[in-house]
Regions:
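Hydrophobic helical h-region of N-terminal Sec-dependent signal peptides
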Residues: 15-19
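C-terminal motif of bacterial Sec signal peptides marking the signal peptidase cleavage site
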Residues: 22-25
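Extracytosolic ligand-binding ectodomains
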Residues: 2-11, 27-406
Length: 406
């Protein structure tokens, strides 16, 4: 049986329009009452009126805002659909939306602010480092929390202590899962036996995918001919790419986010490194950052492939006046579905929103439930990670298309 983690232990281990709310950014000393919020106060606020307060947070500004906007839009779309269909047992969902600007400290401030405003459950955060910080804070409140897209294993589970973060779930697959899947695909499906890796050091997402790709590829019998890294803020990768070129790989695994991937692909072409590149879900949004030729024969894994759910895609376009931007929007939608699944169980049990029993009922329902999501039907394993297939995508004329489910 897995241990359930406390806030203290987690801290040690981890080191867009609201339906009835407003969008704000959270400053550490902006004059809000967030820093003095109490669990008792939040319970009273959550239980007031005929609404259920749900927090939705992400980086709506900053260098990863393309992900945050997509997640928040996807989640908000589903919550508004629930409200339009009568809410949950007649209660409307009040959406508390916060911009954490891609910063872990801001993310905790946003979380605490929403607790003070009476949040009953949280959809968020989006990227790994802020999510780790919020998950640590959320444990003290046993706040039901579903991240759409944070992939680090430690968000839900500490492997060193074999401890599950009891109140936290995710709709996406993990860093280890992605690294292992792409190694399997490279070796078993594409037939590559020699691979190199280039990744950003000191970044949870990048290092997590890289480590698991290397371990899995070698366990299958493949050879990692080179591992190159770079630092936050670097924009010139030619030295690393030239070194990789000299090691004669058949493919390069590049588990980085789309803006850096675009630069790396361009510079790889300039130094004569033309072997196929592989990546993780951070590649989602890459189109426009690399040429069609640079994207040819590349592959990456994702939770969702365009065209998989026309009903969702049409609804997103109708709501926001544009096509969904990347696979993070469907994940936001499914994270919201997961939260509502839990809220429905708590409401059906006649519990009072915001109370300890209510929050535990939400958590228990999610842990044992089956979610009919648009990224697939999924359950949760003992680590609170979804059990589902992954989509392998490639690029055709510069656009990502589904190659196969794997």
């Amino acid at each position: 049986m897995k241990n359930m983690i406390s806030r203290r232990n987690f801290l040690a281990a981890a080191g867009v329009v609201a339906a009835a709310g407003v969008l704000t950014a959270c400053g550490g000393s902006s004059g809000t009452a967030a820093s003095t919020a109490s669990a008792a106060g939040s319970t009273a606020a959550a239980a007031s009126g005929d609404t259920i307060k749900v927090g939705v947070m992400g980086p709506l500004s900053g260098n990863v805002s393309v992900y945050g906007q997509a997640v928040v839009n996807g989640a908000t779309l589903y919550l508004k659909q629930v409200n339009a269909n009568g809410g949950i047992n007649g209660k409307q969902i009040e959406i508390l939306t916060e911009d954490e600007q891609g910063d872990a400290t801001q993310a905790v401030n946003c979380f605490t602010k929403m607790v003070d405003e009476g949040m009953t459950a949280l959809i968020g955060d989006v990227t790994t480092t802020p999510t780790l910080a919020v998950a640590a804070e959320s444990a003290d409140y046993n706040m039901p929390m579903v991240t759409a897209s944070a992939t680090a294993e430690a968000v839900t589970y500490d492997a060193e202590t074999d401890t599950v973060n009891a109140n936290v779930f995710r709709a996406t697959f993990t860093d280890p899962f992605q690294g292992i899947k792409m190694a399997d695909y490279a070796y078993q499906k594409l037939g590559y036996t020699k691979a190199a890796v280039i990744f950003k050091k000191g970044a949870d997402y990048n290092e997590g995918l890289a480590e698991n790709f290397v371990n899995e590829f070698e366990s299958l019998g493949g050879t990692i001919v080179d591992q190159e890294s770079y630092s936050e803020g670097d924009v010139d990768f030619k030295t690393q790419l030239t070194t990789i070129l000299g090691k004669d790989p058949e493919t390069v695994f590049c588990p980085n986010y789309y803006e850096e991937v675009g630069q790396i692909l361009s510079q790889a072409e300039s130094v004569g490194l033309t072997v196929p590149f592989l990546g993780g879900d951070g590649w989602d949004g890459l189109e426009g950052y690399a040429t069609n030729d640079q994207l040819k024969d590349t592959y990456f894994c994702a939770n969702y492939a365009k065209g998989s759910n026309p009903e969702f895609e049409d609804a997103y376009k109708a709501e926001y006046g544009q096509e969904y931007p990347n696979g993070f929007a469907p994940l936001g939608y499914d994270a919201a579905k997961t939260v509502v699944y839990g809220l429905q169980a708590a409401e059906d049990a006649g519990l009072e929103a915001g109370t300890d029993d209510y929050k535990q009922a939400v958590i228990d329902a999610i842990a044992s439930g089956t979610i009919d999501g648009i990224t697939g039907t999924f359950t949760f394993d003992e680590h609170h990670d979804p059990v589902k297939q992954t989509a392998i995508l490639t690029y055709v004329d510069g656009k990502p298309v589904l190659k196969e489910m794997f």
